[in-house]
């Protein structure tokens, strides 16, 4: 996240503050701001993940105690957003827990392409998207004549906005459970059409791989996928690489390297 933060402030010519970080032998985190920031306006940019949650909270606390005027917190990527409700008895709504912690900071917050807006009942935040920047990286000849697809019902609103901005038709992949199998159905003819799959994040990539396979079977031509956050867990890159997806375009909100199939777009100057 350090790279994104540093690059984000370069174009504004805003100085980033020096900090001292460390981990004690017993595993406790140490955080200290090494500059005088009393009465100075401050913007904090940080992802929220399992690995850095405590460091983030300590940085906010340190800034407050040092007398800074924290104007806002910008969160390019927030973990646990998929845990937005109780799906099975006894579960924690971990996304709600994280948002409740952020709420107690009492600082304006901006989050980019959060997976579930249901978390707004736990935290009031400004939601922004980076998807229009990513879709512009798709060749114009593809964008002019294609179908925009939401990989699941939860992404229809997200994909719909992209489709509307490009004046293109929107299609939702409908999933029907038959016994232990989940069958995917399309509500439009994709034969001879180029496809843009729109999603907020790619994690295992399983749904995207299955969708691409079915799209090709139904006669689709070029398949492009755009997603703000590229998690690419496990063997997802390998599986996506074997799929018929022409190009996957993601932002650099997470640390990921470009490859033959994956294009990583720098969004630093759009974050702040």
Q: Which residues does each predicted region cover?
A:
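PRPP-associated nucleotide enzymes
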Residues: 1-272
């Amino acid at each position: 996240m350090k790279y994104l933060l540093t690059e984000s402030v370069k174009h504004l010519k805003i100085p980033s503050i020096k900090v001292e970080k460390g981990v004690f032998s017993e595993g406790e985190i140490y955080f200290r701001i090494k500059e005088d920031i009393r009465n100075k306006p401050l913007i904090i940019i940080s992802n929220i993940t399992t690995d850095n949650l405590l460091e983030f909270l300590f940085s906010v606390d340190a800034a407050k105690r040092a007398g800074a005027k924290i104007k806002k917190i910008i969160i390019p990527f927030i973990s646990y957003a998929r845990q937005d409700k109780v799906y099975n008895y006894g579960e924690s709504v971990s996304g709600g827990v994280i948002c409740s912690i952020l709420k107690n900071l009492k600082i304006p917050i901006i989050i980019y392409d959060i997976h579930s807006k249901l978390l707004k009942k736990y935290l009031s935040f400004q939601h922004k998207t980076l998807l229009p920047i990513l879709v512009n990286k798709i060749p114009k000849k593809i964008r002019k004549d294609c179908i925009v697809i939401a990989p699941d019902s939860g992404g229809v609103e997200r994909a719909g906005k992209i489709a509307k901005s490009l004046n293109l038709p929107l299609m939702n992949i409908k999933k029907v459970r038959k016994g232990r199998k989940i069958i995917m159905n399309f509500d439009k003819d994709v034969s001879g059409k180029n496809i843009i799959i729109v999603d907020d994040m790619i994690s295992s990539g399983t749904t995207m791989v299955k969708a691409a396979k079915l799209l090709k079977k139904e006669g689709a031509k070029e398949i492009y996928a755009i997603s703000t956050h590229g998690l690419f867990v496990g063997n997802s890159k390998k599986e996506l690489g074997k799929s018929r997806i022409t190009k996957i375009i993601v932002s650099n909100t997470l640390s990921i390297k470009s490859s033959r199939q994956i294009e990583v777009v720098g969004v630093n100057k759009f974050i702040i």
